[in-house]
């Protein structure tokens, strides 16, 4: 399925398609309008993140808002992200890995990547009621412990099994990855 590569490329038809295919719309329910705001301004180097607010044709069973992540439009940053397979890894995580995890993860409505252009899009549940850690100031010890409590089971489940479980996921210590990183 084709997908928008920037917030300006979003449209009602595409949003209706992904929400319908994810089982998020009731019979006859359609997105009739939407607006978006950039929520990555000043914090995102490798991506553009927007919050979409949705309007429906009737009382909605679908989400009131979504978070949509796009590859950055800065050529140098996009090259770095693609060299490190960051977009690919995130798409693989949401399409393949997340489904088998027993940890809290935002619902993913759609995730795809175009390898030719290096573009990607990931549409996620909007966790607006939560707050982000401060990238400059850091987080509290309590917040750090909460992260470890959630991430530890993920690491335990796949420790030493990554290559056999996800053969298409390139490791950052692989010869190919190191060679591409040095030569880019």
Regions found by a protein language model. Name each.
Residues 1-45, 55-63, 162:
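Regulatory N- and C-terminal appendages and interdomain linkers associated
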Residues 36-183:
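Conserved ATP-binding subdomain of kinase catalytic cores across diverse folds
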């Amino acid at each position: 399925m084709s997908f928008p590569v920037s917030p300006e490329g979003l449209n009602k038809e595409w949003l209706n398609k992904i929400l319908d295919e994810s089982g998020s719309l009731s019979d006859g329910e359609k997105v009739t309008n939407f607006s978006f705001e950039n929520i990555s301004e000043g914090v995102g180097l490798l991506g553009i993140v927007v919050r979409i607010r949705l309007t429906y044709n009737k009382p909605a069973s679908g989400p009131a808002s979504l978070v949509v992540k796009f590859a950055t439009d800065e050529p140098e940053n996009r090259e770095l992200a693609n060299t490190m397979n960051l977009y690919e890894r995130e798409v693989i995580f949401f399409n393949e890995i997340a489904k088998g995890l027993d940890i809290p993860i935002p619902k993913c409505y759609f995730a795809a990547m175009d390898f030719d252009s290096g573009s990607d899009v990931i549409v996620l549940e909007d966790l607006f009621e939560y707050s982000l850690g401060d990238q400059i100031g850091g987080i509290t010890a309590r917040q750090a412990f909460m992260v470890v409590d959630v991430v530890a089971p993920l690491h335990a489940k796949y420790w030493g099994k990554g290559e056999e479980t996800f053969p298409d996921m390139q490791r950052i210590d692989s010869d190919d990855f190191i060679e591409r990183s040095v030569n880019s």
